[in-house]
Amino acid sequence: MKKIILSVFVLVLTIVLTSCGADEKTIVVGATPSPHAEILNSDAVKNYIESKGYKLEVKVYQDYVTPNKALNDGGIDANYFQHIPYLETEVAEKNYDIVAACQVHNEPLNLYGLDEKTSWDNTKVYIINDASNVERAFKLLVANGLIDSYSVEDFNAQRPEYTSSIGVTIECIDAGLLHNKVSEGGYAVIPGNYALTAWGATKASEYKIFGESTDVAYPNIIAVRTSDVDSDKIKVLIEALSQPEVKKFIEDNYGPTVNYVFKDLK
């Protein structure tokens, strides 16, 4: 009986230790579908990570809220979906202990529509309703003459403050709903990843009317827990994303919709 109990104990201990070892060699990254998860799942990234003795697991999220919570709570090792202003807002509001480890690419914010208008008078334009992106949308609309001025102090998505001498009206809605307005014949300022997920790179380019310049667009980052920023896992992940094969993958698959701008931020 003692031998049986001992054998069972040894078996359980072996399973536990094996599981721990596997976890130490598995890098779990949360990402939104396109282009983030697609980039991570590319051979360019996965082959490099495997060459260093690690395995990459990508968890796909459909929203902007869950990935930071999962990271802060320890459910994933890193996430890839956001830019630094959004991360800073999340950290300030929710007291998350997470930081940017590297920047990878940017996605210029663009105005999309099925047809380009000859006059924007009295047009309704839909924009994203989160505070970190709404100013980008306003700046884009000012630069192209649709609105004259705006204010983002004490931003309220229900009552955005702006003026337009040509009667343009603005409505703030969830990012995931913006592409529907375009499909219905309307106009919307949409983050690049949502446009890619909705239409793919080719259609997104066709529907684009105007957009940010690449030097204005905010870089999308890899975020990690502060305590893990110098861990071996994160070092390998950053190294993988810095490879020239990743740059080529982005250029080949997304064209001007996504721009490779890698920089180590540690």
At which residue positions do the language-model features occur?
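Short, polar/charged alpha-helical segment
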Residues: 34-57
